[in-house]
């Protein structure tokens, strides 16, 4: 084996370690959010908050994420030129976030008099936890070679997909258990994982796989970026409506409620499997093209789920829909890093996560308004995912076809 081949192998190993770390971080963070969502109704009741108001607390969380995800991404871009500073920034905010998170069940246990403190802790937790979304992923664009980014994005999103797959089982496992121990365990694991980011950042800075990028010369995000983010809002809304509102009723046409914990993860199995082969296509053709094709494929899969005549057909359609969403999210991360390649990686990634949060807020608003229970809105909710994924997918394909030719020094979007 020659020196060049050995260097490539070592570089790929280092890159894979970074991707695995980010996957673990996303897994632990998402499972912590799931734990919070499972216990929130119980904790809210202890401080005198009515069950009907819990959805509004969750909407508040998403509204905060919509703002702070972008803000944290911008902050990451400004901090990143000083090696090690980003890890310290994320670590410090994670300490605050975990402290607020651990305190929630203990404060709730003191009764209705602690209601204001309970809400305050939730707000603090939501604001500070945004530091764990876009900023760590921005390291991929700052230190990793462009051809490796799609695969590393797939690795990072694997943590998110695994968390989605195990969430139904986590809900069953935590049923009727005291909230304090799960909150403490998830916070400790998340804190340990997040504090390792500084070490990862310094290691990447010592062994960069691409030349240092000029900082402070970031071009303003133009029309293409705005269209990309708008498309992400639409795609994310399609996912929210399909998976969170429509998937369970689809399954209940052929299965019993007790079977849902085994059927719902089918979507996430497809999600996790499809990202890696799709990352090869993104490497050669760019994220926007894969994002658009995945949107159209997902729309066809939702149509298949809508018209499925038996459980096996529905399972296959849900599997394909999960594949499509996995390809969308992986290629969106890759495209965001390419768009922000000259020092705005965190900002564009933050906008992507803000788009996801905004779509989640919209879905929760629909639930809070009871739209899924109104017969006149049922067709809208059923067909909205098809419309969202097909329209956004087609628009992204058009955008990709009209992109300007790239020079050899610029990443493929």
Give the positions of each predicted feature.
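Juxtamembrane intracellular "pre-TM" segments in multi-pass secondary transporters
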Residues: 2-15, 203-230, 413
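A late C-terminal transmembrane helix in Major Facilitator Superfamily
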Residues: 343-374
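Helix-loop boundary and gating motifs at the non-cytosolic
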Residues: 2-65, 226-231, 236-253
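Intracellular juxtamembrane helix-capping segments at the cytosolic ends
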Residues: 131-144, 327-341
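Structural signature of the two symmetry-related core transmembrane helices
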Residues: 86-103, 289-303
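Glycine-rich segments within core transmembrane alpha-helices of 12-TM secondary carriers
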Residues: 150-172, 353-364
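A membrane-interface helix-boundary motif in multi-pass transporters
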Residues: 86, 172-189, 368-392
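Helix-to-loop junctions at the C-terminal end of transmembrane segments
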Residues: 68-83, 274-287
